[in-house]
Amino acid sequence: MLQPIITLFLTLPFDHSQQLFLVSLYNLVKFTSPAFIFGIVFTVIRKNDQQAKLPLKSYFSDQWDNNFFPTFAWTLFYLIAMPNLQQHGHFHNIATFIWQFFSDNATPHLWYSVMMLQFLLIMPGIKSVCNWVQHSYRRLLIAVISSGIIYFAWLIFYDHFILNGPEATHWYLLDRIFISFLIFGLYGGLSWNFHHEIQTFLFTYWWLIVGFYLLTYFRTRDLFLATFKLTDLANDSYYLPSMAIYALAVILLIYLICIAQKVFMAKINSFSSFLCLSSIFSQCFLGSYLLAIF
């Protein structure tokens, strides 16, 4: 929610230092979409870990109820109740209404819904890759490196032709196809296969993760401030290699925080159990003592 709010604030007459603070905050939270994609795929693979394939009937039934239908309903609401929010033109007949509906041009933020729904559709394929990798480090390297090459090659192509290129207007729909977030979805699924090893690594080398996060944050912030106008947030895109690396750093940091929370809560629960047992033993001792007296 902060991203559109900050974008709105930057249209107000703030001085340079205030704009710098808002842009830095915007850059700080520019990770949410990759992190959500990672978390969604991680969760689906975790829940279906004991099955060779996704139970397609129940899986797609659940996804329709939880994701597809709400997305379609909100899109319809935006087009009918708030038509002024449309992007890339406005509908003026049935054909253009259908186009605006399915291209998710109804509002600026619906591009992410299209992205998420695509990953839900290709989830059986991601599950197949995770099953193929299983717990093989060699296959893991093959999957990680090959998908990384495809992904960063795509980012270079996107940057050259669309983000800062001649086809920004004509090829704008390419900002919402799944390949633009490929590694976040695939790495999310593969992370479950190796979650014990990842947890051990992150908990052991937490200082490295924190340092990596800080380095990538200040690097992406400096790159943006040195290259673009402060108020031109459209160029602070997910589809830059530096932002992709930053998103991965944030995902690792969130993963680390979750592990730390789990360990902390386990200690709290153990301490609570100890206090409970101590209370029981104290009551038993007091009862025995009173019986002995009387």
Where are these predicted regions, by residue range?
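Transmembrane alpha-helical segments
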Residues: I37-V44, I122, I126-V129, F184-H195, ...
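Transmembrane alpha-helical segments and their boundary/interface "anchor" motifs
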Residues: Y26-A35, R46-M82, F91-P108, F119, ...
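Membrane-interface helix-boundary motifs at transmembrane edges
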Residues: D49-S61, K127-R139, N193-W206, I259-S273
